[in-house]
């Protein structure tokens, strides 16, 4: 049978299912380790610090490399990069489950981060190329279900699989899903940019980005232990500022930059990406609230997780609703509505001073609003970012957008945890949780303002 040409090919459900399955290898499977930290500590006979490195390094490496890989997808082929990403996930999963050596666990998790960096921008670019109009919005809705929905379910999923089958089955199932995704994507004609010349990859930009982000991550997670007046803290801060400044200068001069700052001349794209960074940052809410109810109210892990059931359900339901609102109201109104609803939910969850029964009620309602808001926001935001990117740079644009997702989540969790720990030590855990949750509410409010100012009422989308 003759393989369909790119010009004749239209995206179908088979390809879309393959794309969604490839996306959940990160957002559902790789992220589910957040709920099995203690089990990993025993299985690998190592300390909690090593396990925490293994858990966090996947999102960090995904965020650091996703932009560069987005550019490679534009140049060398988006189907090719998606397949490479899926194969990397299989390799990383195998390294994690074949032994009890902590080093292999960390290497496997690192490879899974690179896998996610390949899959996320490449699959968004495939949707941009092969799905048009309402079909594209529908495809983005399912892509969002894989990412936002996967991240919402991952904690329960990881705990359930680890309890019923053993934690290694998380990655055995991930390998099976990866093989199915490869089969479903097979036969799709390649899509790449025709106008981008194959210039030398921006190694300098990548190195500077890695140095900057690693320095910032250490400052946030270890800053209170190091002390703001310590030589190491000051050195890391200087490295972060210096590498960031040099990165900006070199990227503006580069002929083939890692991050094309010209994309940010489009206000709609800038608004979608910046708000996406901040709303992924409010993932710190889950860490702070779950820790608080366990330590402050004496809840078990299962009881704490049950409070957020309304979030998991609503985010999955409302993503398709967000798609319909996008089609009827445009991008801006659903993004504002979603963010506004999320702010209400965040404020309810932050009421840690209430009596236990009242707080539990506020949490359940708050998580409902939290999931409802994120679900409404997800598809319009993704559509705004992708629709406002030039076709020849959609891989880079998608890479930057998903870098904002990964880094927003990574730094949001780190910053929320740091604020919670510092304020709790200075006062008590009730105040510590409230202030940390207010930080998340502040990020959501800033996201609302950015959408209000930057995203136009009617986007001049490039369908």
Curated annotation (Swiss-Prot):
InterPro entries: MFS (IPR011701), MFS_dom (IPR020846), MFS_trans_sf (IPR036259). GO terms for biological process: response to antibiotic. Keywords: Antibiotic resistance, Cell membrane, Membrane, Transmembrane, Transmembrane helix, Transport. It is a multi-pass membrane protein. GO terms for molecular function: transmembrane transporter activity. GO terms for cellular component: plasma membrane. The chain crosses the membrane at residues 19-39, 53-73, 86-106, 107-127, 142-162, 165-185, 201-221, 230-250, 273-293, 299-319, 334-354, 357-377, 403-423, 435-455. It is found in: Cell membrane. Belongs to the major facilitator superfamily. TCR/Tet family. Multidrug efflux pump that acts independently of NorA and is one of the factors that confers resistance against diverse quinolones and chemical compounds. This is Quinolone resistance protein NorB. It comes from Staphylococcus aureus (strain bovine RF122 / ET3-1).
